[in-house]
């Protein structure tokens, strides 16, 4: 079933489910966070180390979903990239060779701040999470197994975009969040491109 995505004077249609990129839903994402809490609720090993794993995994998942960033870019983010005063993350985008400024909510900023306070890096030039892309894949797949949801990192990015579209967030805002250089890229991924949509795009109404 297609969902209408109103914006301006148009009614943009989300693609059919099987035509959309593989993605997770917000409920899936919440399920992953719950799985992190369950996994480390009763640690069998050193409690301090278990708490670090819990906090690291939770922060990875939150940054993946709430920024919509690519996993490699998220893993490269350093503590100095988080601007707590302006409540944004200045995320370096390797694919575009630019910086995407992403607004963050206060709750996520608090979690980042707590992580830095509890686990201060030996070198602030090192990434915040300081794990490899392979390790991040394993962490994410681990919670996919726990919840019974097949998942890979890029499904967070697509999932956020689709969630925002379904929440009637304007297309340019979503495109900026994803760091797309052109909103047509966003349209092609997720929406049915009809002749009317093309006309409105050319006319600058989208």
Predicted regions and their residues:
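Conserved catalytic core of the tyrosine transesterase superfamily
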Residues: 1-206
């Amino acid at each position: 079933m297609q969902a209408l995505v109103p914006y301006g004077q148009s009614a943009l249609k989300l693609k059919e489910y099987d035509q959309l990129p593989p993605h997770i839903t917000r409920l899936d994402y919440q399920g992953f966070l719950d799985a992190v809490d369950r996994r480390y609720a009763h640690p069998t090993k050193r409690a301090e180390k278990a708490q670090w794993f819990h906090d690291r995994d939770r922060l990875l998942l939150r940054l993946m979903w709430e920024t919509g960033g690519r996993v490699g870019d998220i893993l490269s983010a350093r503590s100095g990239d988080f601007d707590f005063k302006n409540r944004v993350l200045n995320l370096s985008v390797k694919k575009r060779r630019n910086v995407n400024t992403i607004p963050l909510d206060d709750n996520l900023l608090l979690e980042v701040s707590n992580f830095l306070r509890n686990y201060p890096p030996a070198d602030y030039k090192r990434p915040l999470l300081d794990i490899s892309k392979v390790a991040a894949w394993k962490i994410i797949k681990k919670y996919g197994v726990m919840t019974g949801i097949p998942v890979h990192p890029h499904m967070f990015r697509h999932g956020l975009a689709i969630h925002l579209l379904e929440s009637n967030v304007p297309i340019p805002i979503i495109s900026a969040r994803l760091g797309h250089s052109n909103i047509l890229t966003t349209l092609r991924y997720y929406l049915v491109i009809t002749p009317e949509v093309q006309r409105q795009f050319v006319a600058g109404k989208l």
